[in-house]
Amino acid sequence: MASTLFDKIWAAHVVDRMPDGTAVLYIDRHLVHEVTSPQAFEGLRMAGRKVRRVDATIAVADHNVPTEDRAAGIAEPESALQVATLEQNVAAFGVPYIPVTDARQGIVHVIGPEQGISLPGMTIVCGDSHTSTHGAMGALAFGIGTSEVEHVLATQTLLQKPAKNMLVRVDGTLPPGCSAKDIVLAIIGEIGTAGGTGHVIEYAGEAIRALDMAGRMTVCNMSIEAGARAGLIAPDETTFEYVRGRPYAPKGEALERAIDYWKTLASDEGAQYDRVVTIDASALVPQVTWGTSPETVVPITGHVPDPAAEPDAGRRAQMERMLQYMDLAPGQALKGTKIDAVFIGSCTNSRIEDLRVAAGIVRGKKVAGHVRAMVVPGSGLVKAQAEAEGLAQVFLDAGFEWREAGCSMCLGMNPDKLKPGERCASTSNRNFEGRQGPGGRTHLVSPAMAAASAITGALADPREMA
C-alpha cells in the first residue's frame, strides 16, 4: 500500500503496538532545555534511574538566558535557578551540554539542525512546542510534556497514537517581497489554529521545494500554530547539501549510505491523506497578524476585520476582545499602524538567511526615532557569521541593538520584554496576550516586514523599501 512520509518514519520507529492502537515509539534524538526538564530529571533521581542514551540526548539553555551583559549573570531568581538546575542535572546524569559560554550556544531549534544533530528520517522530541521546526529536515519532530521528557530520558521511547495525515501543497512561485513566513502565516490564516488538530502536516509543492533550509524551518516551526502535531518536508538535494559537513552528521561513505536511504523518504504516488489543502504562492502578498491568535492574518494591504460582520456570537465576542487588547479599530488599515518596537529573532526567523534579508532592507537607512529595534541571532555561530559578513554592522549603523543568542523577546521569560501597551512587529511565532510581556501587543511578520517597519516606524510593506 502506498505510504506517506509520516507513515514511513512512524513505521520505522514502532517498537510495539497495544490493542488500542497506541505505539511504543523509539526516539532518535532528545533535545533538552532548562524550562521543561527540572522535574523530569528529579523524577529519574527519585526512581534511581539513569538516562538511557546520553549519546542521543543534548541540552542547552535558551529561554531564560539574557541576550546582553551576560557577564552579570541572570538577574531574575527563578530564571537563574532553572539554568543552574539544568547545569547540575546534565553534570549528574552525564548528558552532553552546550553551556551559555559556548560559541555554539543558542536556541535549541536553531542549533539542532545547525550542528547536524537533527537528520532526515529521525524521530526528534523536546519539551517545547516548536520542536516541529526539525521537520524541515524530513524528520518526525514534535513537542512533549515534562512527564514525557522523563519517560524519554529513562527509556528512549514514548507512548503515542498515530496522527492523521494532512497535505498542504503550496504551488506557484513566491512573488518578490514574500517569504516562507508569509507562506505559513497564510496557511494558518486559511485553515485556522485548529485546522491541523490531530494531524501531521506534510508541506509540498513548487514553492516549498524552492525554499532554502531556513525557509523550510520557518514553515515547519509554525505547524503547531495550525494545531498540528508536527510538520515535515520530504528531504531532497537541498537537505542533503545542508547536512553535509555538519559536526554531528555522518561523514564520507556513511553519509552517502545515509543519503541513499534518505532518498526513500518521500510519500509514495497514490498515498492517501485525510485532508488536502492547496495554497497558490503566486497570489500571496506580505502577511501580518492583527489580533491575539496566529490565525488573525491579513495582507499588509488589508484592513482590520469588523466583528459586526461575524455571524457567530462567540467568535464575534472574541474578535471584539482582541481589538480592545490590540487597540485597533474595525476597518483600520494595518499598513501605517504605528509601532514601538521591532524584534528580529526567535526559532522562527533568526538564522543567517533571515538576517541577510533584514540587513538588505535596512542598509544605509535609520531606525525611526521612536522605535526600539533589536536583532537576536539564533545561535552564537549565526552571530559570528553575521558579524563576519558585515551584517551586524549594518544593523548597528541603522540603530538596531545587536544581541547575544537566545529566545529573547519571543516570550516574556527573560529581560527582553515589551512594556504594557507597546506595539511590536515581531518575527516570532505567537501573538497571544502578554506573550512578549504583560500588556504587550504583537504583530507577527516576516524579517523583511520587521526591517521595513523599523525604518518607517509603522507596519510597512517591504515591497516598497527597494
Curated annotation (Swiss-Prot):
CDD domains: IPMI. [4Fe-4S] cluster binds at residues 347, 407, 410. PROSITE patterns: ACONITASE_1, ACONITASE_2. GO terms for biological process: L-leucine biosynthetic process. It is an enzyme of class 4 (lyase). Binds 1 [4Fe-4S] cluster per subunit. The keyword Iron applies. Keywords: 4Fe-4S, Amino-acid biosynthesis, Branched-chain amino acid biosynthesis, Iron, Iron-sulfur, Leucine biosynthesis, Lyase, Metal-binding. Disulfide bonds: none annotated. HAMAP family: LeuC_type1 (MF_01026). Belongs to the aconitase/IPM isomerase family. LeuC type 1 subfamily. This is 3-isopropylmalate dehydratase large subunit. The gene is leuC.
